[in-house]
Every structure is written in structure tokens, then in C-alpha cells.
Amino acid sequence: MDAERLIALEAQFAPAVEQGRGVFSPKDKSHHAPYNLGGDKMAADRNGYAHVYAALLQDLNPQMVVELGVFRGASLALWCELFPEAMVVGLDLDFDRFRENEPNLRDRGAFTVNFPLLHEWDAYGDDVEFLADLPGIDLFVDDGPHRADAIANTVRLVGPLMNPGGVYVVEDFPGGGDILAGAFPQAQVIYAGGLSAARL
């Protein structure tokens, strides 16, 4: 996996815009201000995760990719492009921003070979039935509420559904690695600023 390709794909699908979110979990106590986002994962002037993702995905050929926190859908477009044979699933409480942005993503070349399955899911809830009915997860990306309680709850629910050799990523929360290390004591845990990952 090439970091420059990750940066280029994200830039293709996600120009920066300021956008508020519409729906929050009633248990989410985080700040609800608008986000100035396009794609914020890969580019060095944003979160700069491209090199970490390139290393994490180097030997991974996922058949099941799940991302929590869809927002405008740029990451889903990225995963669908990178893994055209994989089932890509997006979890969120609100898909309105994604649906509004989907034509823009398609105009930019997204979803020509793969389209994600969308499912309403609350990171603070306890519903795992939908995920348990899917094949095991090879790549899980938690880009959800960015709060310790939500991350710990999601790890508790999703962890048992991960395939051996899979990668579990927590974005934009510096304490994510400690949560992952506690949940997966045998895993190699990577700490990279705001991104943490467990290679199972």
C-alpha cells in the first residue's frame, strides 16, 4: 500500500467543507459544533495518517471492511476504491450528509466498482446483531464519537467479531491505544499520535 495513493484518493473524493452533523446519540456529551472537514485522515496538513495506514494495510487483503463514522462518505469511497472485492460497511446514526454528498462523490469517480452497505448504529448502544450476522471483520475503523466510553463500548462489541490477522483502528483519540491494548492483550498495538491500531 502506497501512502501517496492514499493521500491522492482522499483528495479526489473529499475537498474540505464546513459541515455540521445532524443526529447525535443521546449519550454523546461531545461538542456538537460544525466540523471543517473534507477528508481528514491522510494528508500531512490534516491528521497525516497516510504512512501509518500504508504500513497497516501493507499485507492486508480484507474481505470485510467496517467503518464507524461515515459523515460525508469520503472514507467509504476510499475503502471501496482500495478494496473493490471487499464488502464495505458504513455505520453511523445519520446518513443524511452521506446521501447529500453521494452525487458529488460519484462525480469524482467514487463507487464505480463497489458500493458500501449502510447501517444505522449507535456507538453507545449494545446492538451487535447486524454485525454478528456478517462475515468476520478484517479491517475496522472507529472514526465515531472520539470519546473513551464510546470507543471502549465499540471495542467490547466488535472485538469478538474480528478475524485473526485483522486490524482494528481508532482515529482521532490519543488514548485509543490503551483501550485497544486492554481489549486485545496479545495484539501488536501501534500508537501514532491520534491514531492507534491493533493488529490481531
Which ranges hold each PLM region?
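A short alpha-helical cap/connector motif
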Residues: 1-200
